Amino acid sequence: MTYLLRRAELEDLPEMIRHESEIFGHDAWSPELMVAEVSHPMSYYLVARSAETKEFAGYAGLRAAVTGGEGGDIQTIATLAQHRGKGLGRTLLRALLEEARNRRVQDIFLEVRADNPTALVLYESEGFAVIDRREGYYQPDGVAALVMRRHDEGPQGGWTQ
């Protein structure tokens, strides 16, 4: 399946908020947090739609200094259930990594639930490595978070672990 990605705008927030709890359940961000995150000057959020049907398919976000710096964070990658397993998560992740590269960010971090093997395999296949484990991070179920990092040596060096 082919997806169209574009920069998220404040007008996209109602749809993003509507799907947040559907995708993440009790780990969902509050509407207020999502508004603050998407409108933050260091945030870069994308929305994805099916190229064929124009149906909302997901969204993803990065937070990193626009002028570069040592670190940035993948804040979220969210795909609707009917679009999982079709390459959308990878497409969104690669688009965020490209933006991080454009911002000259050297280290990209993310957190993933330890009980989410699908996401873990995706991140590892894109060069992320586990660097820490935070026990009991996700509440109320007490699931650990795995902190992952991907390092870029710079414009000439490419991405490395």
What kind of region is each of these model predictions?
Residues 111, 124, 129-146:
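Conserved catalytic-core motifs of GNAT/GCN5-like acyltransferases
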Residues 3, 7-84, 93-99, 103, ...:
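Acetyl-CoA-dependent GNAT
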Residues 80, 84, 111-113, 140:
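Residue-level recognition of the GNAT/N-acetyltransferase active site
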Residues 24, 59, 83, 122, ...:
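Conserved hydrophobic/aromatic "anchor" residues
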Residues 87, 104, 127:
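Short glycine-rich hinge loops at helix-strand junctions in the catalytic core
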Residues 100-111, 134:
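Conserved GNAT acetyl-CoA-binding A-motif
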Residues 89, 93, 116-119, 136-141:
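Short glycine/proline-centered loop/turn elements that form peptide/ligand docking sites
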